[in-house]
Amino acid sequence: MENPSASRDNKGFCFPDIPVEEMDGWVKNLISEEDMFSSSSTSELMNFESFASWCNSPSAADILFTQYGLSTSQSIIPFGGLEGSYACEKRPLDCTSVPRSLSHSLDEKMLKALSLFMEFSGEGILAQFWTPIKTGDQYMLSTCDQAYLLDSRLSGYREASRRFTFSAEANQCSYPGLPGRVFISGVPEWTSNVMYYKTAEYLRMKHALDNEVRGSIAIPVLEASGSSCCAVLELVTCREKPNFDVEMNSVCRALQAVNLQTSTIPRRQYLSSNQKEALAEIRDVLRAVCYAHRLPLALAWIPCSYSKGANDELVKVYGKNSKECSLLCIEETSCYVNDMEMEGFVNACLEHYLREGQGIVGKALISNKPSFSSDVKTFDICEYPLVQHARKFGLNAAVATKLRSTFTGDNDYILEFFLPVSMKGSSEQQLLLDSLSGTMQRLCRTLKTVSDAESIDGTEFGSRSVEMTNLPQATVSVGSFHTTFLDTDVNSTRSTFSNISSNKRNEMAGSQGTLQQEISGARRLEKKKSSTEKNVSLNVLQQYFSGSLKDAAKSLGVCPTTLKRICRQHGIMRWPSRKINKVNRSLRKIQTVLDSVQGVEGGLKFDSVTGEFVAVGPFIQEFGTQKSLSSHDEDALARSQGDMDEDVSVEPLEVKSHDGGGVKLEEDVETNHQAGPGSLKKPWTWISKQSGLIYSDDTDIGKRSEEVNKDKEDLCVRRCLSSVALAGDGMNTRIERGNGTVEPNHSISSSMSDSSNSSGAVLLGSSSASLEQNWNQIRTHNNSGESGSSSTLTVKATYREDTVRFKLDPYVVGCSQLYREVAKRFKLQEGAFQLKYLDDEEEWVMLVTDSDLHECFEILNGMRKHTVKFLVRDIPNTAMGSSAGSNGYLGTGT
């Protein structure tokens, strides 16, 4: 008998003609027909007085009336246009209806599941089911007349959702929407904020923004057998969520209670020893590449298939299945995250697989060629199901390549590298890709690329395979990381990613996937480069190391900027002549201090071979600013550097920088001692020590050294100054004279102290009066060379849009005092900012210690300038360490 009060009203979920007690009993009797429901718990959960706070919509009555025969089904008008389904847009209204559900048990299960989920969930959530209905000859997904839970703040969005229908069949509609995609794929899809979708990907975008919708997740609902998807449960929140792990757990528990389930992440099969070896090498390669090129993250994708194990549990089996399309899943243990902020993206990839052809990974799997995208954010979600997460984390360019390992035969591995997010220029991306290819060639031992013939025949690696190892000059092992330079020009190395060219700059933004580079395109790229840049080799550059960079650029016929770029391609981070001048200044400073020591006739000479001070007869030596190293000093310095080189047991890797911040990993070079005129002996000996990357940990390839490498000439300066300070205070210092050895008073014992902190500051006793006097003499000596020069410098510090100007004595003020002066003028907290000065190469250099400050003053002195510019930069709170002191200064105070 039809209930006369079953008509709809617009006053929410209420029944004015039926008492609540009677309605509660009616629901209890209906649900008690199912053995799986407990009548006692159902009475409590289905109490409409408590349920009314969640269901505050006119359609709440439709859920019960329509499903249980209290009213006839009513026609609905589909919501056409862009915001609705395209499949039913032009159909007559009288042909479209929402028929009564064929299975009451499924509706009851969903209603019960929502009741259980209500216990676990919090506020600010809309939960609604989408089920397939037949509209004409097609099946569409609709949430009208389906169970739902509602927070009053999302009532408007619920009403808008009732007017939408989405395609329930593949290839039926170009825009299936979020519920349609999940129903077709059977895989959950979520986003922390719907703003990361495009309007065509989330058809209810306008209504979501109007109702302040943020997070959203759609979950497929499967029958107990798990064979097919019968509905989609959509959860919508009012706040942005980093993930939906808690909600997923609650939904799984609620569905299991009513004999339903959802798709879960399959358990990984046990790996064989060969698979473990291959994955371990992939992990080491990805880690080294990310460190060398400063990549935010790199992922390892493996084709796999699903099979049912014990207790009908899905098991992920690695390897391609010829009977069905392979699914690509990431292997978490082999991925590497260099930027910890990207961990959320890796977690999202763990929850979602890719099919063949999806994203650059799927394209690399089927093409056997590297696949590149200049911006993965421009993908459509159907092309790349993880695009909304890529947009959230701001990922930009990426490249993927398919490899195979000799350990596992024809098993494929897809390595996906994400380029730095700040690198957006096509030329910069191309340079980094070329550099990345060279790095891969040196790192891989058993990994090789796959040719088309191997992919078809399934045979072993043939001659067409691009061998990425088999390089006798470079050896890589898991326990150690020892490399040497290839005896070839870096530019001649064949690039694995050379198929991707920067001559298609206009096509990169719009095209995705594999870009096949033709020979003509490569030639056009070379034409854009100057002929000088192509022909300048390392041997040619070495001939100009003794002069200045500007003179070398003029001789080579290029501008200084181009020459710097050429140097970075060869791993030269700073022009050597500047380093030589720095050594000259250091040695002159040492000799001036030695000459000022009292109590010794003639003076002192520092022997870098023995590390001792030798007294000599009276001598006069002029320290002209344009004098170069004498032959004795050069030999002594070379011997001293050679001694210090013997203490290095692990050879560091050199970092080569390219335009746009790209970094290239290169091996240490051994140059010929019989080099051409003007070349230096072992110029790479000191260049390689400038790198901040030292792979010295046997168990952690690519780990950064805990201590920053110190310049060798700075070490020499520290030893000399420390010894002079001890000699000035009457400490134990042996002085050799022509007729014997004189040993001063041994009453005070001390030892030379070297700095062990990362800043490389000189740790000298501040109570040494003789050292203070020596520095004053140095200042007098330096100032005497310039007529009319002042002993004070003008400081111009800029913080944001403000600039202050003040004077200081460069030989009295230390780094900590300079920081205090700047903090006082800008009213900043000490330790909350950092200073950078503008050097002679127009680059901003960090000012951290007193040695940095002295270096700054020496540069100004060489440039004949009396004004220094400082840039004040804020330091994030997370970067402030307690070991640096309260003011963030890493040096020693006075």
UniProtKB/Swiss-Prot annotation:
Residues 747-763 have a biased composition (Low complexity). Residues 517-603 form the RWP-RK domain. Residues 578-598 form a coiled coil. The keyword Transcription applies. Its main location: nucleus. GO terms for molecular function: DNA binding; DNA-binding transcription factor activity. InterPro entries: NLP (IPR045012), NLP1-9_GAF (IPR055081), PB1-like (IPR053793), PB1_dom (IPR000270), PB1_NLP (IPR034891), RWP-RK_dom (IPR003035). It comes from the Eukaryota. Residues 792-875 form the PB1 domain. Gene3D superfamilies: Phosphatidylinositol 3-kinase Catalytic Subunit, Chain A, domain 1 (3.10.20.90). PROSITE patterns: PB1, RWP_RK. Keywords: Coiled coil, DNA-binding, Nucleus, Transcription, Transcription regulation. The keyword Transcription regulation applies. It is found in: Nucleus. Residues 732-763 are annotated as: Disordered. Probable transcription factor. This is Protein NLP9. The gene is NLP9.
